[in-house]
């Protein structure tokens, strides 16, 4: 009944069901790929600005991974028999690394892997709204999508002047890109930048000491919290579909829901509690 009321339908009129939504999503993907969903995300950001939501100068960029909708062991057996993989777009990627000690007590670094995809996103630190995103296979490096996210943010006219991200974005080309676009650099530096002795060491030390860098690093955690909400409450930890474009569909719908929840809180002071069903 609430859905019928929202759509302006009479009590005795038929409401749309899951098959209607499936057909709708399929038609949009066939006609315009993901452009419609990207425009919808941008429209929500535009409406937020129109309603007076404050956007700060700091943007946080990061990626999160989603496990492919594949039984890896069964898939490997199928491929050994000459069959195609269930999801040809998914790939192995590095989830993270951790320190262990071997039998002799010497420290070693081990990597943890996943099979699936990545969502790369940019979030405004003050508003807590996701302003742009793109998706990739799990083996793609994070820094490869940084410039695309920045350009998408700037195209929306957001009052951004600083970008922060973890060490995966410590790429000389990205530092130059930010400088060329007159943006402050708060990308977390790898230790070797300031530990090595060369003529460039002072440049990196000066960057680390800057107010914009320090503020960006302090607030970088916020996007990890947003990703945690996406996985915990909206099922982004695992792909609902097969294929990159359908994974991107899941990511856009999840980001849209996260933004709408955030807007309700910012404009009405009403929080959403409990685990929601995945929307994609």
Feature-to-residue mapping (PLM):
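Well-ordered mid-protein domain cores that form the structural environment of catalytic cofactors
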Residues: 1-2
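A short, polar/proline- and glycine-enriched secondary-structure boundary/capping micro-motif
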Residues: 141-146, 197-198, 276-277
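Helix-centered, glycine/charged polyanion-binding patches within enzymatic domains
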Residues: 167-168, 172-241, 245
């Amino acid at each position: 009944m609430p859905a019928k009321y929202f759509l302006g339908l009479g009590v005795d009129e038929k409401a749309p069901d899951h098959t209607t939504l499936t057909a709708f999503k399929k038609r949009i993907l066939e006609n315009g790929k993901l452009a419609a969903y990207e425009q919808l995300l941008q429209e929500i950001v535009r409406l937020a600005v129109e309603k007076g939501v404050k956007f700060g100068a700091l943007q946080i960029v990061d990626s999160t991974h989603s496990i492919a909708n594949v039984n890896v062991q069964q898939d490997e057996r199928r491929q050994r028999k000459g069959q195609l993989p269930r999801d040809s777009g998914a790939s192995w990627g590095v989830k993270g690394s951790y320190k262990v000690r071997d039998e002799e007590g010497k420290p070693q670094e081990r990597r943890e892997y996943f099979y699936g995809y990545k969502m790369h996103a940019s979030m405004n630190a003050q508003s807590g709204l996701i302003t742009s995103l793109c998706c990739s296979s799990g083996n793609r490096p994070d820094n490869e999508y940084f410039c695309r996210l920045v350009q998408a943010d700037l195209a929306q006219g957001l009052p951004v002047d600083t970008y922060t991200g973890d060490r995966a974005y410590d790429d000389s080309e990205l530092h130059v890109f930010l400088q060329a676009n007159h943006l402050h650099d708060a990308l977390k530096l790898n230790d070797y930048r300031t530990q090595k002795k060369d003529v460039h060491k002072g440049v990196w030390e000066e960057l680390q000491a800057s107010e914009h860098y320090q503020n960006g690093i302090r607030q970088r955690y916020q996007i990890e919290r947003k990703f945690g909400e996406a996985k915990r409450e909206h099922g982004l930890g695992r792909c609902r579909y097969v294929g990159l474009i359908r994974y991107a569909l899941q990511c856009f719908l999840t980001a849209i829901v996260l933004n709408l929840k955030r807007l309700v809180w910012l404009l009405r002071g009403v929080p959403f509690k409990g685990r929601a069903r995945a929307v994609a």
